[in-house]
Amino acid sequence: MKYQSPTILATSALLFANSATADWQFRSRPDLAPPRLNITIPASAVEPGYLFLAPFAGLPDTPTAQHGPRQAGPYILRDDGDLVWSGYAIYSIWATNFQAARWRGRDVLFSFEGDHNAGYGHGHGHVTILDQHYETIRELRAGNHKLVDKHEFHVVNEETGLIQIYQPVPRDLTPWGAEPEQQWIVNAIIQELDIATGKVLFEWLSLDHVSPDEAILPINPGQAGSGYNSSDAWDYFHINSVDKDDQGNYLISARDACAVHKINGTDGSILWRLGGTNSSFTLGDGVDFCFQHHARWLSQASDDDDDDDGQEVISLYDNSAHGTEHDSGGEVHTAPTSSGKIIRVDTRTGKAELVQGFYPPDGLRSKSQGSTQILPGGNALVNWGSEGAVTEFAADGTPVFHAYMDSGALGFGVENYRAFRFNWTGLPSEEPAIVSLEDAGGTTLYVSWNGDTETKTWRFHEVSDKHGSREFLGEAKRRSFETSLRVPGRRVNKAVAEAVDERGGVLRGTGIARIEPEILPISAGKGRQVPHPKVSEGEPVEGAPGKVKGLWEWSAIWIAGWRKTGDL
């Protein structure tokens, strides 16, 4: 949770009392209020694909202050912030680590959903997998009477899934400075599961292989848990990511040991450590990292001894910061900013070198969460965790896109665990939504289809009699989540629309929309109506990312300043 001074609290009460900035985005789907990206570096030379995010409020709502996003959950967005799919209420409770993957030859989505304990950085629940129609096809839980944690689910070879578990257990912790009554420690566990059956194929327990001597944060003063009870167990290791190589070995990121470990996939022994108190490698300039997240192999050791040059390349997100979530100790910083990193290790020379670093445009340093995804073309998508921002970099480290995950007043306090870019084809099972709204000058029809990626044109028809006869009204190119067609000078009492793909085929039709009077939003404090943006014509949307006015312009500047400096 972010630090709040009395001045910030007083100001936030003023700024956040009105959460209506999330409203009025879609006439056909007024129930949806997705975050509006605040884009400070518009996309240029980014790689193909959509953005996959699951932002949530890092600050609690109070009677006088409400925080963004108003609808926390998984989202698929375009680079301009336009909504593709809202997973709000489809993934219920609290959802994170939202991604696309392949399972048994099928394109799928998955996300953790369950309980979120922000103070301890843990969560307990299950992994839910959706198909291309956004229907649930699998829920996956941990085996051996354990609970899945929120941090990791990673699909391997389209068949198995890697998960991570926090298991509090009682131990004698006095050798590490504990009082006799401080008896609880977290046993950090990984499992590999058969996704189809849930069968446990491999399990590894940190206390069987890693001594608490490797902990960076001691049990006292309790910054990583005090150990007095199972809910406050000492989290000495804190696994937050797992990967697997072609030889069956595992790569784990242990945040509270500031180290990445390679684990033998047969007996669980540690093959090497990168970083921490007992590194197997001498760290070159810029390699040093701490409190990291999201370690992934980019290239692996060969299983052919003749071809093996001893080199392996990994990516990770270097937080270089740890917060005070347990209300004990102080915030720890090991570098001026967080960063994404590509690191090469050489098991023959015992050296590690920095291949490339990716540093934040706004000097961001996230005390929790974060991810680094190296994209197929060499770009890197770095998510800044508790700072609620995402950046895409060219391979040389030049930022080509940067955005915060909500705008105006609602941008304050937004966080996001991981962010990704994936190609995706969405074919929703639900029918498209349509509304027909009348004003003094005529009728406007609005249509949208949550999750659809294939519609290129919308065709609109008037239903002219009780038998369902249809009269063509016109068509509009689909340029965003919602498309509109203006019918000037007359009422359209009943209307339908058809989604048409790039080959001219009809994908799906809507139900019948009966005409309603158009209600326009009242601008804050002005007592006047403001026009709704003509979404189908691609006109600028008032209050959209980078286009805030008046009070919101001031608040956006204030928030940006706070993000950059930490000072008011």
Language-model features: locations:
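Short intrinsically disordered, low-complexity segments
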Residues: T11-A17, A499-R503, V548, A560, ...
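Histidine-/acidic-rich catalytic cores in large beta-rich domains
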Residues: S19-G538
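Fungal secretory targeting signals
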Residues: M1-A22, L568
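C-terminal GPI-anchoring signal of eukaryotic secretory precursors
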Residues: P521-L568
